[in-house]
Amino acid sequence: MTGSSKIKVALIVLNDLGSGGAYNYESGVIKDLVLAEKSPFEFLIFAPHKLVGATKQRFPDLVVRPYRSGLITMFFLSLRSSLQGYKLLKTIGLRYGRLERSLVRENVSLAYFLAPNALVLDLVDTPTINTVWDLGHRDIPEFVEITGDRHFEERELFYRHALPKSFRVVVD
């Protein structure tokens, strides 16, 4: 295949070096995908704005683009998550959030979220692959670390909305 006929896949990272296993997992998946011979895919990385420099150093042969996930992004994500909010945003020309606008600009066909990431909920048209590391919160809901500060509900809500819409789900 020529470079122009390859399917563009965005690898969406979330974690920095201080995240330990999460960072190592994301880096390992990227290395495995990039090293695959005769791949029909062209990969580019989307990293949180503050991690772009370190990500470029780690993967100098890949295009790295920034994304933001601050308060304004999360506000629009919550609006876009409801049908009424989506209709309102679509009416005023904000059908897509920042990340999806970047994906469209780059002609990305598939977004692979290498870690659980709330921004997947902001995508309207881009197909996704999502990663689930564990569902342990269901096994031990009696611990305040799991149920305190609405962590249990947060995880359940995320999985309930993100996974059914996913093209594929990777469980590790």
Regions found by a protein language model. Name each.
Residues 1-172:
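Carbohydrate transferase catalytic cores enriched for Leloir-type hexosyltransferases
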